[in-house]
Amino acid sequence: MSLTNKLSIKDLDLKNKRVFIRVDFNVPLDGTTITNNQRIVAALPSIKYAIDQGAKAVILASHLGRPNGQRVEKYSLKPVQAELSKLLGKPVTFLDDCVGPKVEEEVSKAKDGEVILLENLRFHPEEEGSHKDADGKKIKADPAKVEEFRKSLTSLADVYVNDAFGTAHRAHSSMVGIELPQRAAGFLVAKELEFFAKALEHPERPFLAILGGAKVSDKIQLIDNLLDKVNALIIGGGMAFTFKKTLENVKIGNSLFDEDGSKIVAGLVEKAKKNNVKLVFPVDYVTADKFSKDAKVGHATDAEGIPDGWQGLDCGPKSIEEFQKVIGESKTILWNGPPGVFEFDNFAKGTKAVLDACVKAVDNGATVIIGGGDTATVAKKYGAEDKLSHVSTGGGASLELLEGKTLPGVAALSEKK
């Protein structure tokens, strides 16, 4: 599946059309107060574009939280209405359901670019295709009802736009079940696809991936897929210790060791050799006597190893130097996972140094892509989001793309003619 050949909102004629936009308004709430409106702000370009192009109505659908297929008041999208209205500078109509005759009737009356926000899609088990019973067991939704749910959503509009990249790895009804002739990517999704295509389909070389995170076994598919694509791979974070101990018998003290992951280390290194991929590991460490922000801080190198009772929580100055050098030599950089426990100030130096090197690389003409999740949090924490080429909004979705999987929400989009 090519990521670059999908229909985009700009390819559509929206005049006098009812435009259904699947957005991601899964915002953090404190009661009914939105504590971070970033996801709403991110959806504005597609919404405004549809209005400016003369759409008859813009119908917005999203999920919020995990209500498990039932109506749960604290997961209502109602609080988004006022915030969205304020940001758009125009009224927004809120409907207290997302399907059914009442909703269909309200939407059919809309005109003059009216913006309609539907209630949480996940109040219906038919959105996710299942719900959990009291014992946490998965109960599949009735296929006939799923079909009916999808038909009702489809009947609301003339064209479909998907702008919820964070949910693109889920084959949910609002992602794959709206059978309109034209299904296009919104601006957000189009940008995600453009940058991931840049890295995965036609990278400017040298191409470097920086991986962090705790367990090797969680990242097997990711490492395996990237070894077919990159020229160099930095392996940092907790999972570096599994490689170091297995390959070089470095003493790692109480640092993370992934028993299952250790069994596949040799195979991954073999593949890297075969594909001529340079593997870069840390060679020194900032250590702690416990996993805590106020732990005692120590230092260790490969030669002496980490003493028992201590654990490595960040990479040391020599490693930082080596990482910066490799980053500086690269033209395309994909970063997924921090090299240290950046949440604790004493162990954030390595992560900050890698970020600074990435920002510098962008200044020197490289493309740097941050793959969502914790690494996106790093960029936000240090105010670097607009200094990088692209910070992905989808943790799970970007990870699955990088693992070489097809995303259902992307596969469901129409191809450009």
Curated annotation (Swiss-Prot):
GO terms for cellular component: cytosol; mitochondrion. The keyword Plastid does not apply. AMP binds at residues 214-215, 219, 238, 312, 343. It is found in: Cytoplasm; Mitochondrion. It catalyses: (2R)-3-phosphoglycerate + ATP = (2R)-3-phospho-glyceroyl phosphate + ADP. CDP binds at residues 213, 218, 237, 337, 342. ATP binds at residues 214, 219, 238, 312, 343, 374-375. Its cofactor is Mg(2+). GO terms for molecular function: ADP binding; ATP binding; metal ion binding; phosphoglycerate kinase activity. It comes from the Eukaryota. The keyword ATP-binding applies. (2R)-3-phosphoglycerate binds at residues 23-26, 38-39, 62-63, 65-66, 121-122, 169-170. Pathway: Carbohydrate degradation; glycolysis; pyruvate from D-glyceraldehyde 3-phosphate: step 2/5. Pfam families: PGK. It is an enzyme of class 2 (transferase). ADP binds at residues 213, 237, 342. Its main location: cytoplasm. Mg(2+) binds at residues 214, 218, 374. GO terms for biological process: gluconeogenesis; glycolytic process. Its EC number is 2.7.2.3. Keywords: ATP-binding, Cytoplasm, Glycolysis, Kinase, Magnesium, Metal-binding, Mitochondrion, Nucleotide-binding, Transferase. Monomer. Catalyzes one of the two ATP producing reactions in the glycolytic pathway via the reversible conversion of 1,3-diphosphoglycerate to 3-phosphoglycerate. Both L- and D- forms of purine and pyrimidine nucleotides can be used as substrates, but the activity is much lower on pyrimidines. Negatively regulates the biosynthesis of acetyl-CoA from pyruvate in the mitochondrion. Belongs to the phosphoglycerate kinase family. PANTHER family: PHOSPHOGLYCERATE KINASE. This is Phosphoglycerate kinase. It comes from Yarrowia lipolytica (strain CLIB 122 / E 150) (Yeast). The lineage of its organism: Eukaryota, Fungi, Dikarya, Ascomycota, Saccharomycotina. The gene is PGK1.
